[in-house]
């Protein structure tokens, strides 16, 4: 009996010491779950409006490269307008005119991207139109050829850490509140203030993001000039899930005489804007059915005889963009803008708007129907000019406004666009 008691005591002591030892040992680390395939945050393109990015983009595994995503936009548009710029002509496309009516494709584009890992890339190519208010609009094939070529966006990116990255190539600008292509925006037409902003840049860009802050700086060629002389930057702060405030801008640190280049070069690179500086401040509210974005813009170009600019000029402008979604399939978007140029009407040769002392107001409304990846939208836009310089056909001079003689001060545009994004 005593022997059995001794053995039982030893067994109990052994079990107790084993339990204590087990308690002191760290629990084995759980095996990490493999990353879910094809669920990365995409690099682009940005969708800023009621036409939304595909929540399930096409994706395929590419071996050591990782997951590759592809998408695109196939859309067409048409419009009728009053008082076209009938006197518009460019040697770069001698058969192109600003017509009173046009039907064309607005996007025949596709993109491919690798948005994960240290080495990433984004490439977007195809045909496009970038219609804008208050400016001449030519055919989509001509725009694709003369603006940013059939390869408007193509850049590589190195993601050093979760916060830091460096990218280079052809990239969307850091400036402004509207994106280049129609499907990316609340409205079909780009606004008046958009005309002062460079759209696609070639250069190098450094990015930092941490918590609510995101900061980017870039050295670029500005208005697709080919020479890296522009410095641009953007700072955004996300106040909460619904509110974001930001500032962005840039300036040309050099001087370019665009007039000394070909007509083809001048089409994408306007001399006054290329040699200017610009500053924007914007705020965005996005919550439930509402999207609201007001922003203010200031631009300035100094006199520079080397660049063919003999008078300085500035513009001041503000815009309010908004959209309300009544249902998952129907929304209403709108935009109002006002912009003016400094100076006295008829003085100087520097025209950032419609000549010195001119001003412009625009109103746009865009009902939009969406179903899955398909959309259909119509648009009405009105532009009203003030302070234009008037001409006389009898004297062989043209005004700086709309119409055959440049003396018209208003333009109405009725537009429709439809297609799919995928």
Can you describe what each PLM-predicted range is?
Residues 42, 72-80, 123-127, 168-170, ...:
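Transmembrane beta-barrel strands of outer-membrane/channel proteins
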Residues 1-88, 417, 422:
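N-terminal periplasmic/intermembrane-space "pro-region" immediately following the signal or transit peptide
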Residues 72, 101, 105, 110-114, ...:
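Residues on the lipid-exposed face of transmembrane beta-strands in outer-membrane beta-barrel proteins
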Residues 94-97, 134, 141-145, 245-249, ...:
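Outer-membrane beta-barrel pore domains
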Residues 65, 115-119, 161-163, 173, ...:
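Outer-membrane beta-barrel channels and translocator barrels
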Residues 79-81, 85-100, 131-153, 161-240, ...:
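Surface-exposed coil loops of outer-membrane beta-barrel proteins
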Residues 96-130, 325, 330:
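Glycine- and aromatic-enriched membrane insertion/assembly motifs of diderm outer-membrane
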Residues 66, 101-106, 147-152, 198-202, ...:
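Residues that define the transmembrane beta-barrel architecture of outer-membrane proteins
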């Amino acid at each position: 009996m005593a022997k059995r008691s001794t053995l039982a005591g030893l067994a109990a002591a052994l079990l107790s010491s084993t339990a204590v030892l087990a308690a002191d040992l760290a629990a084995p680390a759980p095996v990490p779950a493999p990353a879910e395939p094809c669920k990365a945050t995409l690099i682009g393109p940005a969708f800023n409006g009621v036409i939304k990015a595909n929540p399930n983009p096409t994706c395929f595994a590419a071996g050591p490269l990782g997951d590759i995503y592809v998408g695109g936009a196939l859309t067409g548009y048409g419009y009728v307008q009053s008082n076209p710029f009938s006197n518009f002509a460019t040697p770069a496309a001698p058969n192109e005119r600003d017509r009173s009516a046009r039907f064309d494709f607005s996007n025949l584009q596709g993109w491919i991207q690798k948005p994960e890992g240290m080495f990433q890339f984004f490439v977007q190519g195809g045909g496009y139109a970038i219609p804008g208010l208050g400016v001449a609009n030519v055919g989509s094939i001509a725009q694709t050829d003369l603006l940013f070529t059939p390869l408007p966006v193509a850049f590589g990116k190195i993601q050093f850490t979760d916060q830091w990255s460096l990218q280079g190539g052809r990239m969307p600008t850091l400036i402004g509140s509207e994106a280049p292509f129609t499907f990316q925006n609340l409205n079909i037409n780009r606004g008046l203030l958009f005309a002062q902003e460079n759209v696609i840049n070639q250069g190098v860009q450094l990015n930092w993001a941490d918590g609510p802050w995101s900061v980017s700086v870039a050295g670029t060629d500005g208005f697709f000039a080919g020479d890296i002389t522009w410095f641009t930057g953007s700072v955004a702060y996300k106040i909460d899930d619904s509110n974001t405030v930001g500032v962005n801008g840039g300036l040309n640190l050099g001087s370019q005489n665009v007039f000394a280049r070909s007509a083809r070069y001048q089409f994408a690179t306007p001399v006054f804007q290329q040699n200017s500086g610009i500053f924007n401040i914007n705020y965005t509210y996005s919550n439930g059915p509402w999207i609201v974005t007001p922003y203010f813009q200031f631009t300035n170009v100094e006199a520079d005889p080397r660049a063919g600019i003999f008078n300085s000029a500035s513009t001041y402008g503000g815009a309010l963009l908004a959209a309300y979604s009544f249902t998952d399939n129907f929304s209403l978007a709108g935009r109002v803008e006002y912009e003016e140029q400094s100076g006295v009407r008829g003085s100087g040769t520097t025209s950032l708007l419609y000549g010195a002392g001119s001003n412009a107001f625009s109103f746009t409304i865009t009902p939009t129907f969406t179903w899955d990846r398909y959309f259909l939208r119509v648009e009405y836009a009105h532009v009203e000019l003030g302070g234009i310089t008037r001409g006389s056909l009898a004297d062989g001079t043209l005004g700086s406004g709309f119409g055959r003689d440049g003396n018209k001060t208003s333009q109405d545009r009725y537009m429709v666009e439809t297609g799919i994004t995928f």
